[in-house]
Design a protein with these regions (language model features):
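Interfacial/capping segments of alpha-helical transmembrane domains
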Residues: 25-46, 160-172
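Helix-loop-helix "hairpin" substructures at the membrane interface of multi-pass membrane proteins
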Residues: 185-262, 287-288, 292
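Hydrophobic core segments of alpha-helical transmembrane domains in multi-pass membrane transport
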Residues: 13-29, 63-70, 91-97, 117-122, ...
Length: 363
């Protein structure tokens, strides 16, 4: 029954994605004067060159980190949306470490990423403590802290790291010793991709092969039952958000060291935390599916960007796809009747099998 339920949930997700894509394609056909060009760029543009495919992989890296971070917190039934702020603050603090603390080339990025991760853990840990100590909603407090993080980060960059010779509010150049190397020729795909995949494997192991993972999932499923079972749910709630924050903060540090010459996110929050929510929902909070969901979302965005350059359709079409997907996946009534029929059919079959076994024993 459990396997069938998982299969049904996967079917719901696939159908939601398919329906949203169909709606987007129909919209393109209706609004574009050159629908053939638009559709070709959208669907196949990311595959027409190594550079474009590399763009997909580049965008996939931060989405994996924020998707993992959000997924771990969601599994504990904690709707902490602080991954955005943790990602941003991880990058801000990493800028200080990279620029102000000279180190050997191999050690420099490792230390910088670890400190960025710890920064993210502290950031997401604050709403967790507020939730446990005073019952404050982690959803509301984490949303507010994202904006606090943005303006506090801008203050730090502006007053301590701003390059006066640059034409905008950006930091000094990051030293070469702190940068992550590129791993695919003719692209900007960096070593962060390998780190991201290792993080996925680690979180899958911890989530499904350790006692902590069992406690985390049980607390998310039913916190009262978890307490009756002897689990300290307060500790689980805090630890899930600390780990999620660490992953998001490390992701911000890796994104900075892999793709940027200096810290330059001064116009607005980078948005990867919000995208991580979409990735986590698509992956059903399962770490094993996070890379696939991140790749799918990155592919859509690069395809839409190429479409906007080569045709008369703007890349905001991705917002339509994302919105429809989230609504259908989150809607409890989507395919509800089909699920009831499946449960009823399986229950009837189980009862019939049980009755046959009883008759055989009595006979």
């Amino acid at each position: 029954m459990k396997n069938k339920k998982l299969a049904f949930e996967s079917l719901r997700t696939v159908l939601a994605v398919a329906i949203s894509l169909v709606i987007a394609l129909v919209t393109i056909l209706l609004v574009s004067d050159v629908p053939g060009v638009a559709l070709k760029a959208f669907l196949f543009g990311p595959l027409d060159s190594m550079r474009h495919f590399g763009n997909v992989l580049e965008m996939m890296i931060p989405l994996i980190f924020t998707g993992l971070a959000v997924g771990i917190m969601f599994q504990a039934d904690q709707f902490n949306l602080g991954a955005e702020g943790a990602f941003f603050m991880g990058a801000v603090v990493s800028s200080f470490v990279a620029i102000l603390w000279p180190m050997p080339a191999f050690i420099h990025p490792v230390v910088t990423i670890l400190i960025g991760g710890l920064t993210g853990a502290v950031f997401c840990g604050i709403p967790a403590l507020l939730k446990v100590k005073w019952g404050a909603s982690e959803l509301v407090s984490s949303l507010m802290f994202n904006y606090i993080a943005f303006f506090f980060g801008l203050y730090l960059i502006n007053y301590f790291l701003r390059d006066p010779n640059a034409g905008a509010m950006v930091s000094y150049l990051l030293p070469a010793t702190a940068k992550l190397p590129y791993i695919i020729p003719n692209t900007r795909v960096h070593f962060g991709l390998i780190i991201a995949l290792l993080a996925v494997a680690a979180m899958y192991f911890f989530n499904y092969r350790t006692r902590w993972g069992y406690k985390n999932r049980l607390t998310g499923f039913n916190s009262l039952f978890a307490e009756y079972a002897g689990i300290k749910t307060a500790a689980v709630v805090i630890s899930a958000q600390l780990i999620g924050g660490f992953i998001a903060g490390a992701g911000g540090s890796i994104e900075l060291l892999g793709l940027y010459r200096r810290f330059s996110w001064t116009a607005q929050l980078p948005g990867y935390g919000w995208s991580g929510v979409i990735v986590a929902i698509l992956a059903r909070r399962n770490p094993a599916y996070i890379p696939l969901a991140a790749f799918f979302l990155a592919y859509l965005r690069i395809g839409a960007d190429l479409m906007s350059r080569q045709s008369d359709v703007q890349n905001e079409i991705v917002a339509i796809i994302q919105g429809v997907m989230i609504v259908l996946i989150a809607a409890a009534g989507f395919l509800e009747k089909a699920q009831y029929k499946m449960v009823f059919r399986d229950a009837t079959k189980d009862l019939a099998d049980t009755g046959n076994k009883i008759q055989e024993v009595e006979g």
